[in-house]
């Protein structure tokens, strides 16, 4: 596990304190938000990994002070994250004709209903930030979508 520098720890603390502010300024963050905090810090852990290091399934089950958050974050830094090939393989499942396209509606369904479920608002934001273009039949080229999502962060539009 890589050792974090003091500057990195300070950055973690800043983001942690922002979530603490939203949670009531009690010096802790709800463990339900552990994955969200980590995603804001640039890692994309799977939910099962978040649960393994102390994340919870429901709000209010447990709070994490920074002293407990830090080792959880460090543990998640080393967890496997999805690769471009993984995402392409997943989208191919929905590409019935093997042409590299899926419908925009199906993309929305995949993102909101399967795996790491996103809210409709999150999907709207992703589509906006990636400047996702549908063809005349309402299909999107999923390779372009995956590349744009994985390239983040996005400039202000």
UniProtKB/Swiss-Prot annotation:
<dbReference type="GO" id="GO:0005859">
    <property type="term" value="C:muscle myosin complex"/>
</dbReference>
<dbReference type="InterPro" id="IPR011992">
    <property type="entry name" value="EF-hand-dom_pair"/>
</dbReference>
<keyword id="KW-0518">Myosin</keyword>
<protein>
    <recommendedName>
        <fullName>Myosin essential light chain, striated adductor muscle</fullName>
    </recommendedName>
</protein>
<dbReference type="Pfam" id="PF13499">
    <property type="entry name" value="EF-hand_7"/>
</dbReference>
<feature type="domain" description="EF-hand 1">
    <location>
        <begin position="7"/>
        <end position="44"/>
    </location>
</feature>
<feature type="domain" description="EF-hand 2">
    <location>
        <begin position="82"/>
        <end position="117"/>
    </location>
</feature>
<dbReference type="GO" id="GO:0005509">
    <property type="term" value="F:calcium ion binding"/>
</dbReference>
<dbReference type="InterPro" id="IPR002048">
    <property type="entry name" value="EF_hand_dom"/>
</dbReference>
<dbReference type="InterPro" id="IPR050230">
    <property type="entry name" value="CALM/Myosin/TropC-like"/>
</dbReference>
<keyword id="KW-0505">Motor protein</keyword>
<comment type="function">
    <text>In molluscan muscle, calcium regulation is associated with myosin rather than with actin. Muscle myosin contains two types of light chains: the catalytic light chain, essential for ATPase activity, and the regulatory light chain, a calcium-binding protein responsible for Ca(2+) dependent binding and Ca(2+) dependent Mg-ATPase activity.</text>
</comment>
<keyword id="KW-0677">Repeat</keyword>
<keyword id="KW-0514">Muscle protein</keyword>
